[in-house]
């Protein structure tokens, strides 16, 4: 399957990685990433519920905060965790030693220059990466 045909590739949120890397990460990297995220600087865990199953999931991500806004770059496209949080309207995240509740999730389309985003997320958005944004409750 080509990257352009992958379900994660959607308008405004292009998938930047090749499909083989996506599959490799899901199968081998993700199972060890969540336990390591608890002790690795720069990586955090976002907790969300499945939109169909209702099951609780944890996903390792890199998040950036500016004020009461959290931003996460979507180089993998519109993945299942993003779809789950958009459907639920909320999620929990641990940033540093603080557990935070996220509300009002939304996606900033690739190519957007939004000054309210953290610097790293703003640079990624300008370079063609979609950004997941949510407010801290």
Question: Language-model features: where?
Answer:
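A subset of signal/propeptide-processing and intrinsically disordered low-complexity segments
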Residues: 1, 17, 96-99
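Short, functional N-terminal and low-complexity linear motifs
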Residues: 12-13, 48-53, 83-87
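Solvent-exposed, flexible loop/coil residues
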Residues: 28, 32, 36, 61, ...
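Short beta-strand segments
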Residues: 41-74
């Amino acid at each position: 399957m080509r990257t352009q045909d992958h379900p994660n590739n959607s308008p405004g949120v292009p998938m930047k990685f090749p499909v083989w890397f996506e599959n490799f990460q899901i199968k081998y990297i993700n199972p060890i990433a969540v336990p390591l995220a608890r002790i690795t600087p720069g990586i955090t865990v976002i907790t969300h519920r499945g939109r169909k199953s209702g099951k609780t999931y944890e996903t390792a991500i890199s998040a950036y905060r500016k004020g009461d806004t959290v931003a996460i770059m979507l180089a993998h496209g519109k993945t299942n965790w993003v779809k789950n949080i958009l459907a639920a309207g909320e999620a929990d995240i641990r940033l540093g030693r603080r557990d935070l509740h996220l509300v009002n999730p939304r996606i900033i389309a690739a190519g957007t220059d939004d000054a309210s985003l953290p610097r790293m997320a703003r640079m990624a958005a300008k370079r063609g990466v979609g950004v997941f944004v949510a407010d801290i409750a």
